[in-house]
Amino acid sequence: DLEELEKVKASLPVRNWSAQYMQDPTSEEGAIIKREWWNSWEGKIPKLKHVIQSYDTAYSKKETADYSAITTWGVFTPYEDQGDALMLLDAVRGKFDFPELKLVALDSYKYWEPESVIIEAKATGVPLAQEFRRMGIPVVDFMPSRGKDKHSRVNAVAPVFESGQVYYPKDEKFAEEVIEECAAFPHGENDDYVDTMTQA
């Protein structure tokens, strides 16, 4: 039954769930950002130099609507002899109406206290940015350049991943979901996390 399936889903890595139960193994073929380019980080979150939060918001919570997504990234130095790298700190996705989105966004903001907040200037992102500014939170509006489609934006950030500069906390389900979505792009079912990543 559905409850049992939900339990199985919660216990399996996202990749196994997609392959076994959804009959939809995430293929690496054609992937712009490959799974093996991500580095896992064990232990507690390192000292961060800068925290960035990126928002891709949808129009509504209708079944047919896209998801709203928030990812949080930290800039840090993994090892003394290395330059700066990025760490995926958190990822939240859901179908929210505006009041819910505002609460989720504020919770995430208060928890991570990012220095930079980037919100795509579309859909519920516009009023959300206004609300944040009203509270004294500085927001950067993200406007995709004309002629720069999603594909181009992902291609632009791919070298950062390929050069081994992106980390994720080991054994975190949200990290698995983001990695899987990236590996499935551009053929995956969702790309909301991918959108937030290219903005950050």
Regions found by a protein language model. Give the residues of each.
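Structured core elements
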Residues: 53-54, 71-72, 118, 195
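A residue-level signal for conserved active-site and pocket-lining positions in enzyme catalytic cores
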Residues: 21, 157, 196
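Mg2+-dependent endonuclease catalytic cores in nucleic-acid-processing enzymes, primarily RNase H-like
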Residues: 3-7, 24-32, 69, 76-185
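ATPase catalytic-site recognition across NTP-hydrolyzing enzymes
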Residues: 1-57
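An active-site-proximal beta-strand-loop segment
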Residues: 55-68
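Charge-patterned, long linear interaction tracts outside catalytic cores
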Residues: 186-200
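Generic detector of well-ordered alpha-helical packing
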Residues: 57, 121, 192-196
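Catalytic phosphate/metal-binding cores of nucleic-acid and nucleotide-processing enzymes, i.e., regions
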Residues: 43, 48-50, 74-77, 126
